[in-house]
A protein has these predicted regions:
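Metallocofactor- and cofactor-centric catalytic cores in central/energy metabolism, strongly enriched
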Residues: 1-209, 216-290
Length: 290
């Protein structure tokens, strides 16, 4: 399998993809010894890489929420939707996912899409309905115990908040899980509702940053890319400020969604320019990525 992967046309420079086999090298210690010079060579190559300025159109943002509460759909999620629109306006890409968590609110997406794209989204929803039914479940059972303790009681409430992350830009494409994103704009990638699995697909599709809203206090990170955390309420911000990047609870105190969305967009640019996120500073992200 590894030789096939090394020969994949998607690899810009196959020479940077190296692998050693314990069986072929003659044991564990021999493999470690053989790996040392290879790692030195790769480190020298990596050290020659320099950051260069690129336009905001290069941004590919995975939109995520986890540990949502009753305020997520009022504060953090719609504010992220404003930021999503700003990214798209600059020629960038934002990816909404978690198909089981838009259930009941899909009309808010299909109404912003061409008939062809709308049908692609509905086909994915029908697949998930069938999948749940085959295993004796139903799509209405999605809200977790934590969601319910936070004030979300039905999938419809949760879905309305989840869709708000997508702002108001037209839905330009629907992708299968982990398929490469081929065009900019606001797009949807089919995925389960489980955050690590969904983020894995988004990163495989081309996301270079995750922006993640939470009301209950998720501290997950996703090591291949930075993860910017948005708190939905002031209480979470006051208790877990060391893990949250932006407080969206002040929207309830009068800060407008437009101003908060602009703040999130500026933070996205800062992180893309090298500023570490809180989850990176805390060392999260080694195990959350599938």
């Amino acid at each position: 399998q590894l030789p096939v992967l090394q020969a994949a046309p998607q690899l810009k420079d196959p020479a940077h993809f190296r692998f050693l086999s314990i069986q072929n090298q003659g044991g564990t210690r021999a493999t470690i010894d053989a790996a040392r010079p290879v790692l030195r060579e790769l480190a020298e190559t990596a050290n020659r890489v320099r950051r260069v300025a690129v336009p905001a159109s290069k941004l590919v943002i995975g939109l995520q929420c986890g540990g949502s509460d009753g305020l997520s759909g009022i504060t953090a999620n719609p504010a992220l939707g404003v930021a999503s629109d700003l990214v798209v306006a600059q020629g960038g890409t934002t990816i909404l996912s978690e198909t089981s968590e838009i259930y009941g609110a899909e009309h808010l997406l299909t109404g912003r899409a061409t008939p062809e794209v709308a049908e692609q989204l509905m086909e994915r929803i029908r697949w998930w309905e069938d999948y749940a039914a085959r295993f004796g479940g139903n799509m209405d059972n999605n809200p977790s115990p934590g969601n319910k303790r936070g004030g979300l009681t039905t999938i419809l409430e949760k879905s309305l908040g989840a869709v708000a992350k997508g702002g108001s830009a037209p839905l330009t494409a629907v992708y299968r899980y982990a398929d490469p994103i081929r065009q900019p704009g606001f797009v949807f990638m089919d995925s389960p509702g489980y955050d690590p699995c969904s983020v894995t697909g988004q990163v495989a599709s081309g996301a270079n940053m995750i922006v993640f809203t939470t009301g209950r206090g998720s501290v997950s990170g996703y090591r291949p890319v930075p993860c910017l955390k948005l708190a939905s309420n002031n209480d979470l911000w006051s208790r877990m400020g060391e893990d949250m990047d932006i407080n969206c609870g002040d929207i309830l105190d009068g800060v407008s969604l437009q101003d908060k969305g602009a703040e999130i967009y500026r933070a996205i640019l800062d992180v893309a320019s090298g500023q570490p996120t809180k989850s990176e500073a805390q060392g999260f992200g080694r195990v959350e990525f599938v």
